[in-house]
């Protein structure tokens, strides 16, 4: 079965500032990401990795070009529609977990599901299953401060996919972890992506992890290129 294109960028441009102080990050950039595909985004700091992830995640608007999620153009959509797409179709993972400290692990994973309209019972059942899959189910009733760094990040990954998104965007998801823990967390992330058929774009400086993905891209002269 042919894989579906989940994310497409066509001729995307993004510039910050104006005049002599302007900084062009993306120049007529093209990119495609298909379901079940893991792509590593490897580039030096300051070259636009976060900008690319923000555009793909509908957190920023391109100055030109088009961003399509699951074949649907997203340019010009009102904020409410963009928010709805983010909630239903896109999951985000960051270097720092951003878990809500006052809630337990299972409650953190329940949160996006409750916002999406699931009942407490439905949300708790799925949250518990995801935590079990990420091998932290036994820590479900603990708050983030009581978890190790690797456990926190696995909870954050479970939260990111709680609403079964089509697209996962991760910005240095193992960057704050020691090498052994980073590989352990990535093992869980990779298994989840492969099992669910997610499309995943993962920014990382870790070349060992990048080499485990389906392909690698970088940013060069405002373009997104394979290497």
Curated annotation (Swiss-Prot):
<dbReference type="InterPro" id="IPR003593">
    <property type="entry name" value="AAA+_ATPase"/>
</dbReference>
<keyword id="KW-0472">Membrane</keyword>
<dbReference type="GO" id="GO:0016887">
    <property type="term" value="F:ATP hydrolysis activity"/>
</dbReference>
<protein>
    <recommendedName>
        <fullName>Lipoprotein-releasing system ATP-binding protein LolD</fullName>
        <ecNumber>7.6.2.-</ecNumber>
    </recommendedName>
</protein>
<dbReference type="InterPro" id="IPR003439">
    <property type="entry name" value="ABC_transporter-like_ATP-bd"/>
</dbReference>
<dbReference type="Pfam" id="PF00005">
    <property type="entry name" value="ABC_tran"/>
</dbReference>
<keyword id="KW-0547">Nucleotide-binding</keyword>
<comment type="subunit">
    <text>The complex is composed of two ATP-binding proteins (LolD) and two transmembrane proteins (LolC and LolE).</text>
</comment>
<dbReference type="GO" id="GO:0042626">
    <property type="term" value="F:ATPase-coupled transmembrane transporter activity"/>
</dbReference>
<dbReference type="GO" id="GO:0044874">
    <property type="term" value="P:lipoprotein localization to outer membrane"/>
</dbReference>
<keyword id="KW-1278">Translocase</keyword>
<comment type="function">
    <text>Part of the ABC transporter complex LolCDE involved in the translocation of mature outer membrane-directed lipoproteins, from the inner membrane to the periplasmic chaperone, LolA. Responsible for the formation of the LolA-lipoprotein complex in an ATP-dependent manner.</text>
</comment>
<keyword id="KW-0997">Cell inner membrane</keyword>
<dbReference type="InterPro" id="IPR027417">
    <property type="entry name" value="P-loop_NTPase"/>
</dbReference>
<dbReference type="GO" id="GO:0005524">
    <property type="term" value="F:ATP binding"/>
</dbReference>
<dbReference type="InterPro" id="IPR017911">
    <property type="entry name" value="MacB-like_ATP-bd"/>
</dbReference>
<keyword id="KW-1003">Cell membrane</keyword>
<feature type="domain" description="ABC transporter">
    <location>
        <begin position="7"/>
        <end position="227"/>
    </location>
</feature>
<keyword id="KW-0813">Transport</keyword>
<dbReference type="InterPro" id="IPR017871">
    <property type="entry name" value="ABC_transporter-like_CS"/>
</dbReference>
<comment type="similarity">
    <text>Belongs to the ABC transporter superfamily. Lipoprotein translocase (TC 3.A.1.125) family.</text>
</comment>
<keyword id="KW-0067">ATP-binding</keyword>
<dbReference type="GO" id="GO:0043190">
    <property type="term" value="C:ATP-binding cassette (ABC) transporter complex"/>
</dbReference>
<dbReference type="InterPro" id="IPR015854">
    <property type="entry name" value="ABC_transpr_LolD-like"/>
</dbReference>
<dbReference type="GO" id="GO:0089705">
    <property type="term" value="P:protein localization to outer membrane"/>
</dbReference>
<feature type="binding site">
    <location>
        <begin position="43"/>
        <end position="50"/>
    </location>
    <ligand>
        <name>ATP</name>
    </ligand>
</feature>
């Amino acid at each position: 079965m042919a894989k579906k294109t989940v994310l497409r960028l066509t001729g995307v441009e993004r510039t910050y500032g104006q005049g002599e102080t302007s900084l062009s990050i993306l120049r007529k950039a093209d990119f495609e990401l298909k379901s079940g595909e893991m792509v590593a985004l490897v580039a030096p700091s300051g070259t636009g990795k976060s900008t690319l992830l923000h555009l793909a995640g509908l957190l920023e608007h391109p100055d030109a070009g088009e961003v399509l999620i699951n074949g649907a153009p997203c340019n010009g959509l009102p904020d409410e529609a963009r928010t709805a797409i983010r909630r239903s179709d896109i999951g985000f993972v960051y270097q720092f977990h951003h878990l809500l400290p006052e809630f337990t692990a299972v409650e953190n994973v329940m949160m996006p599901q409750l916002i999406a309209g699931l009942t407490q019972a439905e949300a708790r059942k799925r949250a518990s299953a995801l935590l079990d899959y990420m091998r932290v189910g036994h820590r479900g009733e603990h708050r983030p401060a009581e978890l190790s760094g690797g456990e926190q990040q696995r909870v954050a990954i479970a939260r990111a996919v709680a609403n079964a998104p089509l697209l996962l965007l991760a910005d240095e998801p193992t960057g704050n972890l020691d090498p052994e823990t980073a590989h352990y967390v990535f093992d869980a992330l990779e298994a989840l992506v492969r099992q669910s058929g997610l499309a995943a774009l993962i920014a990382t400086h870790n070349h060992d992890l990048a080499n485990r993905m389906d392909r690698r891209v970088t940013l060069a002269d405002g373009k997104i290129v394979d290497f």
